[in-house]
Design a protein with these regions (language model features):
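Short, mixed-charge aromatic SLiMs
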Residues: 33-37, 70, 120-133
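Residue-level signal for nonpolar/aromatic packing positions in well-ordered secondary structure
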Residues: 8, 77, 96-97, 126-132
Length: 165
């Protein structure tokens, strides 16, 4: 079995022959943006979301640090999308697939989409794709609310280490 979303996307692209250009230049353009998501966007937006929404106590330093980093990352994407219809160029790719889910919760990340007009246009275009809509519907149907301590413990595991001792 394969784990890690980036590895899964690469496997599926190789298996289907879709969403990853055959040309060396095109392939590495997609790969660099996939790595941008895996090494920067995903971890930073995840931390931003955690400290803004789920942290048991609000820590101003953490909220400000990750909100500012989120804004920087959205600016990077906005600049890239100024001259490109998709993240890695002219065609929809696994880079778009990797980045879109992390940006769906932009409201909870302290982001105003109007500040990133090229990103906003891309975000709306990707969100309008029929397959993306179907995927989002599945997620909405399966997602469980985190209203109680048990649900939060399952997601964040804050006491798991203590239980192992």
């Amino acid at each position: 079995s394969i784990f890690e979303s980036g590895a899964i996307l690469l496997y599926l692209a190789a298996k289907t022959g879709k969403f990853l250009p055959a040309s060396t230049r095109g392939k590495y353009e997609v790969l660099q943006w996939l790595m941008f998501q895996m090494g920067g966007l995903g971890p930073m937006l995840g931390q931003n979301h955690h400290f803004r929404i789920y942290a048991p106590e609000k820590i101003d330093y953490a909220v400000n640090r990750y909100t500012n980093e989120a804004k920087r990352l959205y600016s990077v994407l906005d600049r890239q999308l100024k001259d490109n219809p998709y993240i890695a160029g002219k065609t929809y790719s696994i880079a778009d697939m990797a980045i879109f889910p992390w940006t769906r919760n932009w409201k909870n990340q302290g982001i105003t989409l109007d500040e990133y007009p090229h990103f906003k246009k891309w975000f709306e275009k990707i969100g309008d794709r029929p397959a993306v809509k179907r995927g989002c519907e599945v997620l909405t149907a399966l997602r469980k609310p985190l209203h109680d301590d048990k649900a939060r413990e399952q997601l964040f595991g804050s006491t798991q280490y203590q239980k192992r001792k």
